Amino acid sequence: MVEGRFQLVAPYEPQGDQPQAIAKLVDGLRRGVKHQTLLGATGTGKTFTISNVIAQVNKPTLVIAHNKTLAGQLYSELKEFFPHNAVEYFVSYYDYYQPEAYVPQTDTYIEKDAKINDEIDKLRHSATSALFERRDVIIVASVSCIYGLGSPEEYRELVVSLRVGMEIERNALLRRLVDIQYDRNDIDFRGTFRVRGDVVEIFPASRDEHCIRVEFFGDEIERIREVDALTGKVLGEREHVAIFPASHFVTREEKMRLAIQNIEQELEERLAELRAQGKLLEAQRLEQRTRYDLEMMREMGFCSGIENYSRHLALRPPGSTPYTLLDYFPDDFLIIVDESHVTLPQLRGMYNGDRARKQVLVDHGFRLPSALDNRPLTFEEFEQKINQIIYVSATPGPYELEHSPGVVEQIIRPTGLLDPTIDVRPTKGQIDDLIGEIRERVERNERTLVTTLTKKMAEDLTDYLKEAGIKVAYLHSEIKTLERIEIIRDLRLGKYDVLVGINLLREGLDIPEVSLVAILDADKEGFLRSERSLIQTIGRAARNANGHVIMYADTITKSMEIAIQETKRRRAIQEEYNRKHGIVPRTVKKEIRDVIRATYAAEETEMYEAKPAAAMTKQEREELIRTLEAEMKEAAKALDFERAAQLRDIIFELKAEG
């Protein structure tokens, strides 16, 4: 394994609160503190702080985000900060996933249906192989990193290691490649190899642009070259190369034979059990399905849904902890949990949701009981895998605060921007008061966000504001991705002055033009009016120098009090720092990116409005889908995963409408 060092490349030095936050976190890690929390206010440069920490402690790092979009953003940022190190991306490789399920009430079996994204599968292989080759590795993952993977020992042992001068029969190499689930195929794809006389060309599972050309002289490897898969151009000579398995669920032949025996034994026991309960249909179904899978495993070495037999393949006892990405890391690794107030509850909930669905399949003869052991980690198992962990959030939850000896604060923004001022006003006459405030913002060419508690109120308020002559849009959960991006962009361009919504905490709403956030029914305790939600909502006005928040309420709840006091405390710290250093807060300047060039542009609104998707012919729609798919692939290649994900959602919508 290469002992690489992290090299942070950035055009600026840590500023404001960042140097002290970095020093405290690094000191904690060096002293062996297990849990630490970074309380970083919105827009204080938390990613840059964490990058500095990673560079200084020099440990393999796993960064966990709560969805693919955020993971994509973090991956792009970290790749820019660490261009000379291995920054990898590990998220669920399904573009679309319908898990296997059974609905007993209607006797409906839903087969597993999935569309695997080849690009993401490649990146997953690249991530696991990097962990075996070097130490300067950062893997950005979604919560899917706690789902079961194959055994890391098995994965490591089955690596095919080739050196110049090594004695190995050509056919023996081909057999070893087939053992690790490579296919022989003359058309070049990841996870395949092709043979031309004494030359074997291998296309590793972790990349599709390069292939490894192994040249034999008799039974000896004469030379190894890295070749451009497309042009055939030689990119370099290699003395040694390691070919990693094409699947994370690989097993040696003798282990597979043992696993098949154990599966057969479990099948016999389960069939006897079902028949004794008079469940003859379930028994017949289970026998038919399992025998087919066993036949495939004997003949091909794998079967569809092989992960359901992962406990047997790894020869693990019932109920034991499954292997996950965390087991591929060395023991001294570091975990960073981004937006921990959302990510930790997600990690906690994964096991129960998965278990409930699989239990129904087992009860009705679709799967053996051992399938229950192909599962995500429980939260307790996740805790046991932690070596050292840093939770990052603007509003850490009770778990993080309880487990961290002290919270490291990062309150000051490099831009000098302050947390917004807050007013609490009575609900009587609130709408007329709000209209007056909105008009003030319109005159200054600033925007307003209004959050309500119910859908009905949001709709009524939108209609009322429209009647009052205000340019307003309503953002709700049923709005499709394409429209959502378009509405946010139009708000920034000034087509709308106000955005009304229920949940303003979703990503994509950090808009520098917003100087006023109005919170209606602020005194109604609940999920969207808890102290954490209120602080996050207040943060939506923190990117503008005139940021202000109005809470309409008749009483001040405990959550409101905590949120107001916390915001005031942060603002006082920020003001003091600005005064000391002579900093004048300036609104963030953020370019208005044209997210989907092919579908609309502000400059050509007439053309776009003339052809909404519903009015397109089948041919025009197909042409648009082709263009968008090409753009999506380009965006993925350029590592702009946020844009690629948005384009993917739009393509789904267009296909659904067609």
UniProtKB/Swiss-Prot annotation:
Residues 27-414 form the Helicase ATP-binding domain. One of its GO terms (biological process) is nucleotide-excision repair. Gene3D superfamilies: P-loop containing nucleotide triphosphate hydrolases (3.40.50.300), UVR domain (4.10.860.10). Keywords: ATP-binding, Cytoplasm, DNA damage, DNA excision, DNA repair, Excision nuclease, Nucleotide-binding, SOS response. GO terms for molecular function: ATP binding; ATP hydrolysis activity; DNA binding; excinuclease ABC activity. It comes from the Bacteria. Binds 1 Mg(2+) ion per subunit. This is UvrABC system protein B. It comes from Bacillus caldotenax.
